[in-house]
Amino acid sequence: MVMNNKKKLVILGGGVGSMAAAWQLTSQPNWQDIYDSITVYQMGWRLGGKGASGRGDHARIQEHGLHIWLGFYDNAFDVMQNAYPMLDRPPGSPLATWTDAFKKHSYIVIAQNYNGKWYPWSFDFPENSSVPGYGAITPTLWQYILRLIDFFIKHFRDTGMKLYVERAIESDEHQSAIARLNHFVETKLAGLEIGAKTLAQNLLLVIETYVKNLSERASGPTEDDHQQIIWLLKELHASIERHLKEKINFDLEIYRFVVVMDLAVTIAIGLLRDRVLFRPDKLDSLDQEDFREWLARHEAFDETVSCDLLRGFYDLVFAYHNGDTDRPSFAAGTAIRCLFRILFSYKGAIFWKMQAGMGDTVFAPLYLALKKRGVGFKFFHRVQRLGLSADKKSIKTICIARQATVNGEEYDPFVRVNDLDCWPATPNYCQLQEGQALQDQNIDLESFYTTWKDVEEITLQSETDFDDVVFGISLASVPYLCRELLTDPKWQAMANKVETTRTMAFQV
């Protein structure tokens, strides 16, 4: 008798985390030597989690929010670049390749409230020849700071010079700043000729030269170097404040320039002043403080801390306690890491726009590719709770409610729209024994609050039905589905302290 030592793996939930896990596990050349089966249990009729989409009346795309991918999503694009060829779609057919499904999008507009009126604040980010998913090398924190400094120097030269006008009769403080800069050049950059330019022009040249010299040094910058950079940046910041700050409430262009410069310069000053590069946990060391509070601590202007640019950034990740916009909460280190990745690590374009719903462009291809690899899918299976073993060290049982009965052996989840496999906005009722009742009662099988009576409860047993478990359901479900795990202090801390935000979407 041949013993089968292969394991059974169950994946709970069909969102992006679960699909990424299924893809990675089945990307190993010998995965079928390890696992006898991999099965995904998903409530309702489709995959996607928050990224799900469906085709409603007249095949209109319905989804929870407008989804885009950022240009630094190397892992996600790598998956798509490998999944799409497995679909064998004919050339010229809808979404035949990943480049058909994702297009560069570089023009971004934020609504800005300025002096009681709304204005579009537009950004047209330059594109580059890099391809997301290839050559994924993340810059070091020091390299990011260098890119940040390079950015605001270029921004000042391109935008600020026409706005920055030094007064004909300068203040004593201005003259003192010139003297301090001349002394710095004499002692730190001997031989550099700064000439008869404005103070701002000279400051930009000195910062650029000093930082370039540091970047070429094999040993990297010292703490003293950081202090010198801080001094230079504070001189630049003070010059902007002297000559432009008082004008921001009367000139929209000046307001925008000052806010962008203040934000960039303050981030650089704050990172160096907090000695983040010398801390073992780097940016994580700042995560006990809200990003806006961190900026204020490092003397950013009030107008910058409250600007619509930051509001849009917080909105992007729903960074508010319980969704309350009066209680912003974005961990400073995480926020800075996000900004750096978004602005200085993108490939091709800052955003890539899906050419259909996220379900059509991401989760339908993943479903089809994973099925080809041998992954099983059980739709209409809602996880109810996980039970632990007697020693509390492993999962013993998984209780699952079957929501509906499929006619035949397997549920076909798609509808065809212009020769493209798409998820419908409601189940394919004709494939379900309870389909008519679900339709008549307008039941939403994806709702946490559904009143629908489940068909039956199934209990999966470890070592019989599964050996390994991937829990891919939203973190917010843990207190409801994994109560026994919460006796562990680490699980309890995660459930209590890592917040999620409820969101609502609508279409008109």
Predicted regions and their residues:
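Glycine-rich FAD pyrophosphate-binding loop
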Residues: 26-55
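Active-site/ligand-binding neighborhood in enzyme catalytic cores
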Residues: 154-457, 461
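A short, Lys/Arg-enriched amphipathic alpha-helix followed by its capping loop at the start of a domain
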Residues: 21-36, 369-375
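Dinucleotide-binding Rossmann-like beta1-alpha1 core, especially the glycine-rich loop
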Residues: 57-183, 205, 220-246
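Beta1/beta-strand and adjacent pyrophosphate-binding region of the FAD-binding site
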Residues: 3-17, 39
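Short hydrophobic core segments
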Residues: 10-12, 41, 383, 462-478
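Central beta-strand plus flanking loop segment that forms part of the substrate or channel wall
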Residues: 493-508
